[in-house]
């Protein structure tokens, strides 16, 4: 295809942020740059500076909703001054400034429909923003067939033929690192098997159920450790600080850098992720599997679609059942090894080349129909 001028608008972007949406846009940014396209990114600055002249990081107030005026005003101004062949927004928060800049044709990515699926979202504007972004988008991409169908279910007026599933992908750096894992374990002064969670500390992530399951499993396996990586969201900040005081036997790692994450995955004997809502793909379990760590996760539709039989699936909000699966897997070395070996070929399908090629087809379709 001809070389394109592309602009990605994404509130978060890796390695400054570690959420799946941020990693997705970093992955496609790298792919299209490597293909020789002129690609720009507009994003917020949350944790660290990204030293790339093609990535514009906007200084924002790092609190819920306080980022809104700064990010939107700077993005609108930038989009009104510059012309692009493709403008692609990451989630409704990335799409809104595109619409406000009066850009009539653009592509959006919807990763999940959390505000429709959960009861903890008390602000109806989040649902309205998703509907607004979906209805205004020329085309929409998702990371699973489940989310593609969910968009049509919750927003019936949208044409299903403008929604495209790309899945997601992982980087080559996610591979077993036994030496680095052992060194990390020694640095953290951890002895015994490790139950690992890496992700946002959010209510819908089922983190409290993971802690309950760990406490149950620890009665059967006293040497068991729980390592939790990730930062709390706005709603969970106070609870997270209380946990750190209450659970002295749990290692709360906080924000883990991109460079360190593969070693953490490799250090775990089991990776657990236990969301009960708002998951469109499930990137962290794929990364963990690639690092040679077996996975236990909730039996949400997106996880069943993406992981299939390459993880142990447990119904959400059942910490006792989760604990039983943790105990059984830790006591069954052959089953752990079987899960690891069986999944190695499976994870190879999730590459940025595969995602990028699908997106190239959609971009060409977009250009042809402008």
Q: What kind of region is each of these model predictions?
A:
Residues 294-297:
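Short hydrophobic beta-strand element within catalytic cores of glycosyltransferases
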Residues 135-162, 170-172:
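A short, active-site helix/loop in glycosyltransferases that binds the activated sugar's phosphate group
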């Amino acid at each position: 295809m001809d070389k394109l001028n592309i602009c990605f608008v994404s509130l978060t972007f890796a390695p400054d942020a570690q959420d799946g949406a941020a990693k997705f846009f970093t992955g496609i940014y790298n792919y299209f740059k490597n293909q020789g396209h002129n690609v720009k990114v507009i994003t917020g600055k949350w944790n660290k500076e990204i030293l790339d002249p093609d990535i514009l990081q906007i200084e924002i107030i790092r609190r819920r909703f306080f980022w809104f005026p700064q990010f939107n005003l700077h993005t609108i101004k930038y989009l009104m001054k510059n012309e692009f062949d493709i403008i692609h927004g990451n989630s409704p928060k990335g799409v809104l400034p595109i619409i406000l800049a009066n850009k009539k044709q653009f592509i959006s990515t919807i990763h999940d429909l959390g505000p429709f699926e959960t009861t903890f979202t008390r602000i109806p504007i989040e649902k309205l923003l998703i509907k607004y972004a979906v209805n205004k988008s020329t085309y929409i991409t998702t990371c699973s067939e489940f989310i593609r169908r969910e968009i049509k279910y919750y927003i019936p007026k949208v044409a299903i033929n403008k929604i495209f599933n790309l899945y997601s992908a992982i980087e080559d750096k996610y591979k077993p690192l036994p030496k680095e894992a052992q060194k990390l374990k020694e640095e953290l002064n951890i002895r015994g098997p490790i139950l690992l969670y890496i992700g946002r500390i959010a209510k819908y992530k089922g983190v409290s159920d993971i802690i309950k399951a760990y406490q149950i499993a620890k009665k059967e396996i006293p040497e068991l450790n729980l390592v939790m990586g990730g930062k709390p969201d706005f709603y969970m900040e106070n609870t997270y600080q209380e946990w750190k005081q209450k659970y002295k036997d749990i290692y709360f790692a906080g924000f883990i850098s991109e460079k360190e994450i593969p070693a953490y995955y490799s250090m775990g004997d089991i990776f657990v992720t236990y969301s009960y809502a708002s998951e469109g793909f499930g990137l962290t379990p794929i990364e963990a599997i690639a690092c040679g760590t077996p996975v236990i996760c909730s039996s949400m539709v997106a996880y069943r679609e993406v992981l299939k039989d390459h993880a142990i699936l447990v119904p959400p909000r059942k910490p006792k059942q989760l604990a039983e699966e943790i105990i059984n897997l830790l006591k069954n070395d052959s089953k752990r090894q079987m899960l690891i070996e069986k999944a190695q070929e499976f994870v190879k399908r999730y590459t940025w080349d595969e995602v990028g090629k699908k997106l190239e087809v959609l971009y060409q379709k977009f250009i042809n129909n402008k």
